[in-house]
Amino acid sequence: MEFSQEAFLAFLLAAKRATYAAQGDDVTVPALLPGARQLEYRDGAFLYRDVYFGGAYFVGQETVYYEDVPIWAMSYAGGVAPTITADAEIGAIYAFLRTALLQGTPDRPYRGPQTFQDGPYTYADDSAGGLHAFWGRETISQENRTIYALRYSGGFLR
């Protein structure tokens, strides 16, 4: 089972951009687990699968397979502040999040860029480690108030 880190990174970024961040339903497949949403993206021997539960607050896991063997995973949990309940506001925050996630780069492939600002929202991501083992926290703020937060961790499986 041989693949280069460059090929893996290119695939991971393409998969993330084509799934949740794309804002479309083209990659939604029937979920393996009851009550979950499942997104998948395949290119050659690589398969990306994102399975999550919830909406305003959610928990999920991304897994990358190579030749049908799981090789990398990231678990995550987070959501909008509990005081935010209006569907329109939640929708606007998640639309901004998707825009931020489209800005991921090979040196920051887990979520979005270190910082990103558009309109009233500011996205920030603080992570540590590398592809083999990492963890981090992303936030969205508005007028110096955190309105969304998510924690994540993962790495290559051994």
State the predicted function of each range.
Residues 1-158:
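Cysteine-centric segments in proteins
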